[in-house]
Amino acid sequence: MTGIMDSVEMPKLPENQKTFAGIPEAVFLEEIDTFMSQPENENCEKVLQRLDEQHGKYRFMACNLEARRRKLKSQIPDLERSLEMVNVLRKEDEERETQFLLSDQVFIKTLVPPTKTVYLWLGASVMLEYPLDEAEALLNQNITSAVGNLKSVEHDQDFLRDQITTTEVNMARVYNWGVKKRQAATKTTATTPS
């Protein structure tokens, strides 16, 4: 699989986008005092709640991307094995004895005659018969597409990790800002005579 992974280029990103999935970018809060002085950010708890909600959305996206990555990682070897089988069938010019799974732990021996066609599962309970050349072309196309999709997903995962980290840092900075403000308010009330 590494040979195929190296030979397939990552698809081009859409113009003015940093991700394939359209993941929104988290803005790093450079000037926390300026940010917190804006009218919509007057309450530290509400800002933390908004950031926590954004963090939760990023985590949800990360779970979805990981599930997609796992599916693609398992799909690529299956496609490669199917392609290998098409190549084996192409080379065969006489009957070949093989075993296939009849049920759990039960195999049966059979003779496979030379063939010029193969049946491929296309998904959604659809199976079609293809000549060996067309089957090979389709499988190569599917492998290339799956590898490209895998690279896109891995790129988005890297980007998403950065957004999660940025959001976590922002949450920590806002929380610390709130602690300092409460400490300053406590000091002010403690030093002012009643």
Curated annotation (Swiss-Prot):
GO terms classed as biological process: centrosome cycle; establishment or maintenance of neuroblast polarity; meiotic spindle assembly; microtubule-based process; mitotic spindle assembly; protein folding; tubulin complex assembly
Role description: Binds specifically to cytosolic chaperonin (c-CPN) and transfers target proteins to it. Binds to nascent polypeptide chain and promotes folding in an environment in which there are many competing pathways for nonnative proteins. Required for tubulin stability and spindle and centrosome formation in cooperation with Vhl.
Domain of life of the source: Eukaryota
Origin species: Drosophila melanogaster (Fruit fly)
SUPFAM superfamilies (UniProt xref): Prefoldin
UniProt keyword list: Chaperone, Cytoplasm
GO molecular function: beta-tubulin binding; tubulin binding
Disruption phenotype annotation: Pupal lethal. Most mutants die just before emergence from the pupal case. In mutant larval CNS, neuroblasts show bipolar spindles that may lack one or both centrosomes or monopolar spindles having one or two centrosomes at the single pole. The mitotic index is elevated twofold over that in wild-type larval brains and the ratio of metaphase:anaphase two- to threefold over wild-type. Mutant neuroblasts also show a decrease of 25% in betaTub56D/tubulin beta chain-1 expression.
One Pfam assignment: Prefoldin
Protein name: Prefoldin subunit 3
InterPro entries: PFD3, Prefoldin, Prefoldin_subunit_alpha
Family assignment from sequence similarity: Belongs to the prefoldin subunit alpha family.
Assembly notes: Heterohexamer of two PFD-alpha type and four PFD-beta type subunits. Interacts with itself. Interacts with Vhl and betaTub56D/tubulin beta-1 chain. Interacts with tubulin alpha-beta heterodimers by itself or in complex with Vhl. Does not interact with microtubules (MTs).
Tissue-by-tissue expression: Expressed in larval central nervous system (CNS) and pupal testis (at protein level).
Subcellular location: Cytoplasm
Gene Ontology CC annotation, any one: prefoldin complex
Coiled coil regions, renumbered to chain: none
